Amino acid sequence: MSRVAKAPVAIPAGVEVTLNEQTITVKGTKGSLTRVINSDVSVVVEDNEIKCSPVESAKTAAQAGTARALINNMVVGVTDGFVKKLQLVGVGYRAKLAGKDIDLTLGFSHPLVHKLPDGVTAECPSQTEIVLSGTDKQLIGQVAAEIRGYRPPEPYKGKGVRYADEQVRRKEAKKK
């Protein structure tokens, strides 16, 4: 069995977990998340813990580890939430909020407008920073990757949209 799947997920106080066949719902102070679990994995809720185990063969052990990690992310999301920070590096690169949209100026001939999905909130503490937050880790990472994808950091000057904790590997310019 997967080492990840062997560890049970602790259910903190104030979190309600509902298991209905292969659908798990986690409700907490920050919201509610629902996910369908693979049928190769059996999920059991007992003694304020969630345990995942593979149903049949060793081939499904990896699925059990994945299911356990997803459930843990749901529990952490509804209690603490997730935050992803982006930095805009470059002359004239700016971001500003307009309702549920982020207006981005990234050196193109036109401004870019990125619509935020439900469940993701954004803040712009400065013109060159974007802070995304919410309960669903996958959704926050997806939105951050889409925004970064408009102008990924380039290796020569380091300009572009990068994650706050990302190290951009720089290259030396060509010599004559």
Swiss-Prot record:
GO CC term (a single one): cytosolic large ribosomal subunit
Keyword annotations = Ribonucleoprotein, Ribosomal protein, RNA-binding, rRNA-binding
Among the GO molecular function terms of this UniProt record, one is: structural constituent of ribosome
Instruction: Work out whether the entry's keyword set contains RNA-binding.
Output: yes
Record-level GO BP terms: cytoplasmic translation
Q: Which Pfam families match?
A: Ribosomal_L6
Top-level taxon: Bacteria
Q: Where is this region: Disordered?
A: 151-176
Q: Where is the composition biased (Basic and acidic residues)?
A: 151-170
Q: Which SUPFAM superfamilies match?
A: Ribosomal protein L6
HAMAP family, from UniProt?
Ribosomal_uL6_B
Family designation: Belongs to the universal ribosomal protein uL6 family.
Q: What does this protein do?
A: This protein binds to the 23S rRNA, and is important in its secondary structure. It is located near the subunit interface in the base of the L7/L12 stalk, and near the tRNA binding site of the peptidyltransferase center.
Alphabetical list of NCBIfam families matching this protein: L6_bact (TIGR03654)
Assembly and oligomerization = Part of the 50S ribosomal subunit.
According to UniProt, the name of this protein is Large ribosomal subunit protein uL6
Q: Which organism is it from?
A: Shewanella pealeana (strain ATCC 700345 / ANG-SQ1)
Question: What gene makes this protein?
Answer: rplF
